[in-house]
Structures are given as structure tokens and as C-alpha cells.
Amino acid sequence: MIIGIGTDILQIERLQAAYDRTKGRLAEKILGPDEMLVFQHRLARNHKRGIAFLATRFAAKEAFSKAIGLGMRMPMAWRSLQTLNEPSGRPVTSYLGTLAQFMQEKNWEAHVTVSDEQDMAIAQVIVTQKIRGSDE
């Protein structure tokens, strides 16, 4: 059963400006620990791709907060949702702290997709009720 759907789109240039204005602290505020490692690696290899990664993760967090219907307030916090990639490239969510407990208690799971193209980043999240007794 679908609980909620959320979408977010943003101009990468605006995120770049905020990143520059905060001297990089924006990434520390937004990204979870595993996302931060990926971001730092990508940023070191290619600055533009690193910022695109940050933008897609920002969009995923915004879309997720809309899908669960609570906005950006507890149990949702910037760093408590991580969007990581499986070896195949498929994006998957992981939860930290209070959000992990919230998702487990509700028996919800999130399905996420992210994309970026030159100046825009987008994410869509669908939150569903897990079927009891299912591993999926």
C-alpha cells in the first residue's frame, strides 16, 4: 500500500551558491556519514559531479519528507536519511536514529530515484507499507 509520494527538483547552481556561502558546511549539515564519504570522494575527483551528488541527496531528503507527510521535522532530520547506491547503481535509502525506529514501527519502506542533468537535480520517493512476513 502506498503511504505517500514526494518529489523535489532544484537548480544545482543555487545549491552550489549555498555550499560556497557556507564554506562547505552545508554538506556537513545535510549528508549522513556514509553519504559524506561518497561526496568527498566524488568532489575530489570532479567538483561538478560532487556538487550534483549533494544536490540529488538534498532533493531525496526533501522528497522523502513530503512522502512521509511530516515535512522536515522529527523524526525526519537531514542526516537521518541516507540515499546510497547498490553496486548496480540502484539508489536505496537507509535510516539513522529516531527515523530508523519510526520507519520500523510503522513498517514502512521508501523507494527512491534521483537524477541530475547539467543544471537541475530531481528526486522522487514513494513510501509504502511493507507486507508483514516479507523481507522486501
From Swiss-Prot:
Q: Which Gene3D superfamilies match?
A: 4'-phosphopantetheinyl transferase domain
Q: Which compartments does it reside in?
A: Cytoplasm
Main location, first listed in the record: cytoplasm
Please give the Pfam families that the UniProt record associates with this protein: ACPS
Q: What is this enzyme's EC?
A: 2.7.8.7
Looking up NCBIfam families in the UniProt record yields:
acpS, pantethn_trn
What are the BP-aspect GO terms? Answer: fatty acid biosynthetic process
Q: Which organism is it from?
A: Polynucleobacter necessarius subsp. necessarius (strain STIR1)
Gene that produces this protein: acpS
Q: Which HAMAP family match?
A: AcpS
This chain belongs to the protein called Holo-[acyl-carrier-protein] synthase
What are the top taxonomic ranks of the organism? Answer: Bacteria, Pseudomonadati, Pseudomonadota, Betaproteobacteria, Burkholderiales
Q: What does this protein do?
A: Transfers the 4'-phosphopantetheine moiety from coenzyme A to a Ser of acyl-carrier-protein.
What family name appears in the similarity comment?
Belongs to the P-Pant transferase superfamily. AcpS family.
Reactions it catalyzes: apo-[ACP] + CoA = holo-[ACP] + adenosine 3',5'-bisphosphate + H(+)
The UniProt GO MF terms for this protein read: holo-[acyl-carrier-protein] synthase activity; magnesium ion binding
Question: What does UniProt give as the signal peptide span?
Answer: none
Q: Write down the required cofactor(s).
A: Mg(2+)
